[in-house]
Regions:
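C-terminal output helix
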Residues: 85-87, 101, 105-114
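Receiver (REC) domain active-site loop signature in two-component systems and cognate sites
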Residues: 56
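Active-site residues of response regulator receiver
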Residues: 53, 81
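Short amphipathic alpha-helix used as the core "switch/output" element in two-component signaling
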Residues: 37-40, 62-74, 91
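Acidic catalytic/metal-coordinating carboxylates
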Residues: 33-34, 60-63, 84
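Helix-turn-helix DNA-binding segment
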Residues: 132-150
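Active-site beta3 strand of CheY-like receiver
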Residues: 6, 45-51
């Protein structure tokens, strides 16, 4: 199971706080000061959970979610914000985020949310590996075996 958490927040104190919390909790945090910083490495970044703030200069958190999904990135995303409201939460959930947390949030809630996201990612990776294995077996079938299978 992956234990990488990508933290994207323009607030340096928040990034450092989350980095410390995640590291102390056994995760491997990677921090970025802006959405563009993460997007620059997103295609080669280690799989894991993404935790992003909504309100950031330049590209905001929801725009980041949209760009990641447009690129085919399906990593679980947790959105955090100090200025949450129902319409914003609905918009984030419709964009495909795994969860929406309003600051201040409890450390335990954040950690449980991240663990749930990483567990789901591990299950998805397991299913993909199994599907790949099945396809490899099917590719080895003779034409007659394929006919029987149909």
């Amino acid at each position: 199971m992956s234990d990488v958490v990508h933290v994207i927040d323009d607030d340096e104190a928040m990034r450092e706080s989350l980095d410390f919390l995640l590291d102390a909790s056994g995760f491997r945090p990677r921090t970025y000061a802006a959405a563009a910083d993460f997007l620059a490495v997103a295609d080669t970044a280690e799989p894991g959970c993404i935790v992003t703030d909504i309100r950031m200069p330049g590209m905001n958190g929801l725009e980041l979610v949209g760009e990641l999904r447009a690129r085919g990135n399906s990593l679980p995303i947790v959105v955090i914000t100090g200025h949450g409201d129902v319409p914003l939460a609905v918009e984030a959930m419709k964009a495909g985020v795994a969860d929406f947390l309003e600051k201040p949030f409890s450390d335990d809630v954040l950690l449980a949310t991240i663990r749930r996201c990483l567990d789901g990612l591990a299950q998805s990776e397991s299913h993909l590996a199994e599907a790949k294995r099945i396809n490899e077996i099917l590719d080895q079938l003779s034409p007659r075996e394929r006919d029987v299978l149909k």
